[in-house]
Amino acid sequence: MTHPKELPFSTLQFYATAPYPCSYLDDRQARSQVATPAHLINADVYSELVKNGFRRSGIFTYRPHCDGCEACTPVRIVVDQFIPNRSQRRAQSRHSDLQTSVTKLVYLAEHYDLYLRYQAARHAGGGMDQDSREQYAQFLLQSKVNTRLVEFREDDGTLRMVSIIDVLDDGLSSVYTFYDPDEANSSYGTYNVLWQIEQARMLQIPYVYLGYWIEESPKMSYKKNFQPLEALRRGEWQVLP
């Protein structure tokens, strides 16, 4: 893992949080390394931070800094080498009629309602299913970098999915996506990643950053379906077998 003093961020400071319960692996404690001050982390600086394994939640920019654990692995899709597999092609075909709208960050009650439904169905008991409007906005609608909100709707206007995406100098960073949980085996999440890959191709930027992958976490297993996938290990990006 690259040490902050080796990064070209002489105006930033980095500190480690106190331990807290890990969100991904049961019975483990996690810590984060946080980049501050937030007002100095603009789009260019954030792009470099992402290349070095950082992510953001609202204006909170961090990377894992756990004692004795390196399970969280930053991963990114190599756009110009990606070829969809059969199930991904099915997802592409199934949802190709969805209408997309790319906007700046904005609060809509319709988005918030979908977010709560998604959390209640997919992450019940995790705390986020009880998020207030203020917590939702702090998590997804506060950004000091180049961020877009993407709506996916049916022809009749029915909202199916919302995605928050950061535009970096070398790729797109998938911040968070939530979708209609009422359709079983909808493959909305897969379609969303495919959409981001196509957007990166159009923008002629080489990567789609998917955040962290944990081998032991079933919730993250879908990320390995997008090949070739690169992982940041010991400060170097390398193809993940």
Swiss-Prot record:
According to the lineage, what is the superkingdom?
A: Bacteria
Function, please?
Functions in the N-end rule pathway of protein degradation where it conjugates Leu from its aminoacyl-tRNA to the N-termini of proteins containing an N-terminal aspartate or glutamate.
Molecular function (Gene Ontology), one example: arginyl-tRNA--protein transferase activity
> Family per UniProt?
Belongs to the R-transferase family. Bpt subfamily.
EC top class, in one word? transferase
- Might you give the EC number(s) for this enzyme? 2.3.2.29
Question: From its record, what is one biological process in GO terms?
Answer: ubiquitin-dependent protein catabolic process via the N-end rule pathway
Q: What is this protein called?
A: Aspartate/glutamate leucyltransferase
Q: Which reaction does it catalyse?
A: N-terminal L-glutamyl-[protein] + L-leucyl-tRNA(Leu) = N-terminal L-leucyl-L-glutamyl-[protein] + tRNA(Leu) + H(+); N-terminal L-aspartyl-[protein] + L-leucyl-tRNA(Leu) = N-terminal L-leucyl-L-aspartyl-[protein] + tRNA(Leu) + H(+)
HAMAP family in the record: Bpt
Q: Which UniProt keywords apply?
A: Acyltransferase, Cytoplasm, Transferase
Q: SUPFAM superfamilies this protein is in?
A: Acyl-CoA N-acyltransferases (Nat)
Which PANTHER family does UniProt cross-reference here? ARGININE-TRNA-PROTEIN TRANSFERASE 1 (PTHR21367), ARGINYL-TRNA--PROTEIN TRANSFERASE 1 (PTHR21367:SF1)
* TM ranges: none
Q: Where in the cell is it found?
A: Cytoplasm
One GO cellular component term: cytoplasm
